[in-house]
Design a protein with these regions (language model features):
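Mature hydrolase/peptidase catalytic cores and their serpin-fold inhibitory cores, especially
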Residues: 1-169
């Protein structure tokens, strides 16, 4: 399993069945998840696969069961980017889809749910189970115990699909 060490945190990447990865990012003692998130180094690790600070090793991973969900209002952000007509009763135009039925949007929300338990990782509408890859024998064994607040991310091709924090493991 990949083990990454940064200035304020360490992390492991768990390979999922479809080639995605689930990252667990644990702040070092004396640092908080907010410290790690503010620094941004973790994002470089997730996006660029910073192999310089990565080791292949056997990891005894202990992850608590958790269920994280969030709903984000996208309407304000879309309007700030200039997407306004669809929210206006007089200017919206969905005729290609609805024919002559006039409709407009009153809201735009994104809901996300990530669950992890003994059976695997469930995110949004799909289920993934841990898979195994083994490029080389591990150098050493490390215990990686998520027993204090941590950050998680699910990525595909180094693109974050889901990210969140668990504050009470």
């Amino acid at each position: 399993m990949n083990y990454y060490y940064g200035d304020k945190f360490s992390a492991v990447a768990l390979s999922l069945k479809n080639g995605s990865r689930m990252w667990f990012i644990l702040p070092d003692e004396g640092y908080t998840t907010a410290d790690v998130l503010a620094d941004g180094q973790y994002m470089q690790m997730v996006l660029q696969q910073d192999w310089e600070n990565t080791k292949w090793m056997k990891v005894n991973l202990s992850v608590p069961k958790f269920d994280a969900n969030s709903t984000i209002n996208l309407k304000d952000g879309l309007q700030e980017m200039g997407v306004t007509d669809v929210f206006n009763e007089l200017t919206s135009n969905f005729n290609e889809i609805t024919g002559d039925v006039p409709i407009y949007l009153t809201a735009a929300n994104q809901s996300v749910r990530v669950q992890i338990d003994e059976e695997g990782v469930k995110a949004a509408a799909y289920i993934e189970f841990p898979g195994a890859t083994s490029p080389a024998p591990p150098e050493e064994i490390i215990d990686f115990i998520l027993d204090r607040p941590f950050i998680f991310a699910i990525t595909t091709d180094s693109i974050p699909l889901f990210m969140g924090t668990v504050n009470t493991p």
